[in-house]
Amino acid sequence: MIYVGIDIAKLNHFASAISSDGEELIKPFKFTNDNDGFQLLISKLDPLDKDSLIIGLESTAHYGDNLVRYLVAKNYKVCVLNPIKTSTMRKNNIRKTKTDKVDTYIICKTLMVQESLRFVTFYDLDLMDLKALGRFRQKTIKQRTRLKIQLTSYVDEIFPELQYFFKSGLHQKSVYALLKEAPTPEAIASMHMTHLAHLLKVNSHGRFDKEMAQQLRVLAQKSVGASDSSLSIQITHTIQQIELLDSQLERVEAEMTEIMKFNDSVIMTIPGIGYINGGMILGEIGDIHRFSSPNKLLAYAGLDPSVYQSGNFQAKKTRMSKRGSKVLRYTFVNAAHNVVKNNATFKAYYDAKMTEGWTHYNALGHCAGKLVRIIWKMMTDNLEFNLD
């Protein structure tokens, strides 16, 4: 076998290759993190037997992602190593030097001593996409939530009576359409009744009729809100930002849905798990074989119980540790909530925890833990959901 070690950095990478006998086949060389650099790497590898090549690199941030995709697309065997493994090899090295060139040899030697290697597949690349999309989705939702809070505060100042008029709240299409065109009570009060009624009816799919439009105009005429032009500008701009984020979320979720449909994961057989929750779970877990037991997956998600013990005392009720992936933990709890609503066994388990005196969120945490164990088994053995 021929082992290729690549030390990853932001702008430039280093690579070298040695045979299974330890013979240096490619001396350490630098190549850029772009198409020219990737082609230089391939030109160095071309003289070697491709079927004998195993390429290894450390899992470090996102700087190596494009290179991994490039190599997998060209059908090279690529292994992403845990930095802990290369660190152990580095400590065992007689020379404690750490340079980019030395690190390429360390990666090669780490590949050589592994009992088994798992190579990156196209499915793994899809998981990388799901993880990136899922995290971007979470970040976008947080941004949108902050904007909605800001918008509520602006409307409270300029038209405080409005949020009580719309029973479903301010954050709906019909209210946004109204406020973009007439962000102040004065503007609403001066609108022609036919136009106001039409605007509300069209954007609420017929839920708001002419009578509601009349009531709204009377409310606007009597409003005690502040007449502030700066607030009206902030309202219209904030709504535009929210709508932009809404459109971005639609695109992200559509892409996640396409990836999930293509891969047809067994976790989609769980009642209550949709393409988005399922995609976020798969993306955050990655390779399920990284976790030798469901307990390790629980710990990775931070859903394992924290233990409090002092002398002969041990707490009977403990909280989840919350030390793992925050995104994965949130997704599991959210997914558990949906599964409880769609599966009798999970509903009974949830009810039992509530009967024991746990709060709603504590009970959901227990359900999430149960869901983790089931998903670990399903993904490990490729089994469809069946609690019967």
Predicted segments with their positions:
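A detector of single, family-specific signature residues
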Residues: 1-388
